[in-house]
Amino acid sequence: MWAARTASAWGDAFATVALGLLVWDRTGSGLGVAGVIVAEIVPVLLLAPFAGVAVDWFSPVRVMVVADLARVLVAAGLPLVAGSVPGIYAVAFAMSAASALFNPAASAALPALVNEEELIAGNSGIWTAAVLSQIVLAPAAGAVVATVGYGLAFWVNAASFAVSALLLSRLHLLRPAADAARAAWWHQARDGIRVLAGHRVLRALAAGQALAALSAGATSALLVVLIRERLGRGPAGYGIALACIGVGAAAGPLLLTRLITDPRKPAFIFGPYLLRAAVDAVLASVRVPVVALGSLAGYGGGTSAGAVTFNSLLQAETPPAARGRVFAAFDLIWQLGRLASLGLGGWLADAAGITAVYAAGAALLVAAALIGRAGLTDHRHHQEKRR
């Protein structure tokens, strides 16, 4: 599993850089690049409920292999339509559709491979490999595009999916009996929502996910605006900012595995939200580049550590037979919040300035931490009363 996810992350590093550069080259506008983001979000909104059903109905490994093989074909075909902007958007849409299947399947597979005490370490290993791949290979991808062209970068991505599919095909998981497998797909999707809504911990996590997405969608997308307008730095400054986030994101899980193995500690689940809120508040109030860049390293660490503990708790608490549907629902919540945040953040930046965007982002993250922690505390008290 780790080797397959790492191989896929290598290809993603090349594809992310190459796709952004390709769209900018063909359109020459930020709106054109934003179109790719929309093309990547829409498939998740359309397919997530049914993708979750597929994961619960079939083996997660089988779903991942099929998704990877689909991504091989799509990624390999991208150079053929590289001259057409609609063609590029169509490929981005198809890649995201396959990922809408792969991601909940991958989340469902890990808790079937390791026990609960190993979830933190397992998620940390996967996350760290992905972040390090981005840090190391993103500059290499830019160099490949500059010297060889776009085609090689996308073929590297296709090859990475082929390697991932080959490695995953050797995994064999025991699949829990799906008691809803004989029901209609829509009924199964609806039952997954009922599982989420009826579980105190999952509700708390969903509320935190929604508020965090409303914050992160805008602050991440508009970081380049903050670097340019508030800190007065150009492309090099933006690159350094991303590097600072990457260093923090790589260090976060490594530190986390030394501190805890229990994924149910609220301080390590929702505490990272408060850390990220503090960073957003700093970015909204300071103009000193060194301070801002240093805080971004903390943001990266909080994001990665929070993602690991959040996903580990989600995997530990979700009933095995409903994992695919619940994880797909969380993907849907994230993308809906991200899409809303992009629109609202752009409007707020134009109306009140970039500082207001980061101040609002900080407030949303504080709310996410407080609401999420309250939900977990309520669950714990409920369990104690039942005893």
Annotate each PLM feature.
Residues 1-387:
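Alpha-helical transmembrane-bundle signature of multi-pass membrane transport and export proteins
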